[in-house]
Curated annotation (Swiss-Prot):
The lineage of its organism: Bacteria, Pseudomonadati, Pseudomonadota, Gammaproteobacteria, Enterobacterales. This is UDP-N-acetylmuramoyl-L-alanyl-D-glutamate--2,6-diaminopimelate ligase. Pathway: Cell wall biogenesis; peptidoglycan biosynthesis. Carboxylation is probably crucial for Mg(2+) binding and, consequently, for the gamma-phosphate positioning of ATP. UDP-N-acetyl-alpha-D-muramoyl-L-alanyl-D-glutamate binds at residues 29, 31, 159-161, 187, 193, 195. It holds the Pfam family Mur_ligase_M. A motif (Meso-diaminopimelate recognition motif) lies at residues 416-419.
Amino acid sequence: MIKIINLKKFLFPWISTDISKIKLNSIKLNSKKIIKNDIFIALYGNCNHGKNFIFEAIKNGSSIILIETKNILKHGIIYFIKNIPIIYFYNLNYSLSELSGKFYLHPSRYMNVIGITGTNGKTTISHFIAKWLFLLGEKIGIIGTLGYGCLNKMKKSKNTTNSAIKCQKLLNFFLKKNINTVVMEVSSHGLHQNRVNNINFFSAIFSNLSQDHIDYHKNMMQYEQSKWKLFSKLNVYKYIINYDDVIGKNWIKKIPNSIIVSTKKNSIKKFKNLKMYVKDIFFHYFGTKLSISSSWGSCVINTKIFGEFNINNLLLSFVALLTLGYNFKSLANVAENLTMPNGRMKIFYVKKIPRVIVDYAHTPDALEKVLSAIKLHFKKNIWSIFGCGGDRDKSKRRVMGKICDLYSINIILTNDNPRSESETKIFNDIKIGIKNLNKVNIIPSREHAIKFAIDNSNEKDIVLILGKGHEEHQVFKYKKVFFSDQILVNKILYKT
């Protein structure tokens, strides 16, 4: 929709210009997607600078171009090509969230945005919150790994946390649809790249921190600092932290008014903070029964949720809704109907055939939590099928091999997005962590690996397929092909 914008006000306080009214349609980062009256944002990229594509943007109809510069002396310089203003903008990437917020009328100021960060659990927590409100008959917007939209009506997205422009655009979209609460997964990449700088968060949730993305952040300290940005530098009203995580314990010391959750009843009773913890817990074949105590009340719920780590996710979700003012008893009454999100601890069961579980776990911590949860609930032998992504953090491969070795009677190494890296090299890196190589089979074809495990295991076993979960593709060097663990398992077990 075309807007007539006062460019002088729009660029204030960053840039002073005499250009007043200008027609603007939307803000875009991709010159190929520019249409008439769009703003083209030319940022530094991994391989190219966006300024190399300004002529394409002009040809496609851009009405104004902002070029990121790291030279402060160039800031505010304006020149024209075919009467189109080209403006240099110092550190544009940092200010893009606020600029986009201006364009989309700062939607987060008029709604409750729940931001979730952590290595694992972001998608599950956002799903629990959305499902809980769905059970109460309310709508909530979702932005995250599984896409964006409302529960059961999601559109796929490329990244967990969208670009600064897309985040503001989506919040504006939800607001126009009278959806006043949005749950957003906030990744370390999104935080480091300033994508959510200008979003007002009603609450920020921290789930956990463990090894991941070291190929990007270089070390765990940098990785933690990226996550910490949500709690230390952005506009947040309520802080909700998992005390069972080591980093969470440290952060609570830095944020004395944070709300604390724990699955261990004696760990947080001493705190005067608002809190929620588990008094008693029983893991069974069909889920988990737990007794909860909190600053809002106590209850006993029987859930279809597996694993202690997912109980943490449930508590964090519960507290997030309580801080928004939802009734404790109403939430507790429908908790038994909560389900896991797509591709998380997805259980397939057919009589006289091994139970098959598909899970997204692709980090050492997530792997260990899923494996230990299966032992806890089912007490069966585990066949683990997994691989590690190519061109990504290599240091976690041997660790994941070691963890699988501890819990599994059989390990099948297979492809999981090898990209441009040699699959043999990836498998060899994983094998370094495995002491008993006699239990290892290498089957590069993921389809053949899954079929082999199901055919050769028995009904007393669990076949655990790790790494992809909801994903529906395999990424190789020169191609991206359709592949879904869940569709394949359905086809094998149910002949569909």
